[in-house]
Amino acid sequence: MTTPVVTRFAPSPTGFLHIGGGRTALFNWLYARKHGGRMLLRIEDTDRARSTPEAIDAILDGLKWLGIEWDDDVVYQFSRVARHREIAEQLLAEGKAYRCYATTEELSEMREKARAEGRAKLYDGRWRDRDASEAPQGVKPTIRLKAPLTGETVIEDQVQGRIVWQNENLDDLVLLRGDGTPTYMLAVVVDDHDMGVTHIIRGDDHLINAARQKQIYDTLGWALPTMAHIPLIHGPDGSKLSKRHGALGVDAYRAMGYLPAALRNYLVRLGWSHGDQEIFSTQEMIDAFDLPAIGRSAARFDFAKLENLNGHYIRHCDDAALMTLFENALDFVPGGADLKPKLNDVTRAQLLRAMPGLKERAKTLIELIEGARFIFADRPLPIEAKAAALLTPETRALIDRLRAALESVTSWNAETTEAAMRTFAEQNNLKLGAIAQPLRIALTGRTTSPGIFDVLAALGKETCLARLGDQGSR
């Protein structure tokens, strides 16, 4: 019988869900879903100063916004400290760990000596076999693992391949600090084991941790989960993604107007590939995803590519679904709060009618919202400077005549208003472009907009006639 797949995402609360963490969570979620398993969420909150409720909520909110749903209740590492201590004491009682009374000064000397001699191993093992009766007064001991002194520690990694460490270069790592708090290395192993984790998918900056954690697994006689260490995300210049490259948190991408589905699609392709396919539905991701298809090289974050992909998702999004995304984004994007009070049955209907034209011109929700501002504008419309310069007395007189021609349209839609304007143009020996721009300025306050007949249809007859009247010569 095959053991059900259990993955986990285990972030530390930093105040936001890092974009790299979002990709790690996505990979864990996809792998679990592909194999009919579960993805668990563990918050590694042992740093009490940083682990505020707000910092934890930022991670949970980021995952929910990305559409990554975890299974079961969230596990909080700090709540399991007693269990971590229990395992350390068990290893001590079995002679597989020992108390180390080395002082801070002694440890510093050991590190300096090891570095001077070019040795990877920093701790010299001086308390490994000494009797506790020799312990100095006033020193609170740590508990260290009795790591193997010879041989190799080997990880068969699903991404990195076979990785070998010489045990002579690995320290007897600390399991329990002098104040009784467990170290990260011990806590992670105990938690993963107790949670039934079968696959650990995480960044390759944890590779050295894998060697140390395997030694704990081996000492306890526990089965090592399958490991997959994925390459980190780098900036466009090839260096590690940092603040200077721009947004780091998932929340920042929401504020920049990216769609969750687009960001998921972009993140899954950072380091993983499936032939030449670029666009994936969620189900296609689940069906195609596999660990060996993840490359070993760092993936470069390309903001232009993300923006183009986001534009694709906006253009192909159902209008009603895009309406929901539009409204939800108002709480997060710059200037969104100004529009929110203006959402009502009338403006929602106008927005829905305008959506086919608006979404063709937008790569982000911010651009979509900016393009739609004319719908929510109060009368008389604010006219941008470039457009105002075109509102000559002659243009205003033309707007009066256009309004009169449109007033006679009974069944109001893009086709009927276009027919009326074409007839007007022919009767007055004008090109259609000569009347489209005055209409656009009067109806939107701008020189650019969706197709003018789409604008007429979206706003409706009453609003259009009122706005045209505002900009006419009367």
Swiss-Prot record:
What Gene3D superfamilies does this protein map onto?
A: 1.10.10.350, HUPs
BP GO terms, sorted: glutamyl-tRNA aminoacylation
Keywords, alphabetical: Aminoacyl-tRNA synthetase, ATP-binding, Cytoplasm, Ligase, Nucleotide-binding, Protein biosynthesis
Residue sites binding ATP per the record: K243
Per its record, the protein catalyses:
tRNA(Glu) + L-glutamate + ATP = L-glutamyl-tRNA(Glu) + AMP + diphosphate
Show where the record puts the motif 'KMSKS' region. 240-244
- Give the EC number(s) under which this enzyme is classified: 6.1.1.17
Report the principal subcellular site.
Answer: cytoplasm
| PROSITE patterns assigned | AA_TRNA_LIGASE_I
Give one GO molecular function term.
zinc ion binding
Q: Which GO terms of the cellular component aspect does the record hold?
A: cytosol
What InterPro entries does the database record attribute to this sequence? Answer: aa-tRNA-synth_I_cd-bd, aa-tRNA-synth_I_codon-bd_sub2, aa-tRNA-synth_I_CS, aa_tRNA-synth_I_cd-bd_sf, Glu-tRNA-ligase_bac/mito, Glu/Gln-tRNA-synth, Glu/Gln-tRNA-synth_Ib_cat-dom, GluQ/Sye
**Which SUPFAM superfamilies does the UniProt record give?**
An anticodon-binding domain of class I aminoacyl-tRNA synthetases, Nucleotidylyl transferase
Q: Where in the cell is it found?
A: Cytoplasm
- Per the annotation, the residue ranges of the short sequence motif 'HIGH' region are 11-21
**Which purpose does this protein serve, as stated in its record?**
Catalyzes the attachment of glutamate to tRNA(Glu) in a two-step reaction: glutamate is first activated by ATP to form Glu-AMP and then transferred to the acceptor end of tRNA(Glu).
Question: What family is reported?
Answer: Belongs to the class-I aminoacyl-tRNA synthetase family. Glutamate--tRNA ligase type 1 subfamily.
Assembly and interactions?
Monomer.
- Cite the PANTHER family for this sequence: GLUTAMATE--TRNA LIGASE, GLUTAMATE--TRNA LIGASE, MITOCHONDRIAL-RELATED
Task: Please state what the protein is called.
Answer: Glutamate--tRNA ligase
Q: Which organism is it from?
A: Nitrobacter winogradskyi (strain ATCC 25391 / DSM 10237 / CIP 104748 / NCIMB 11846 / Nb-255)
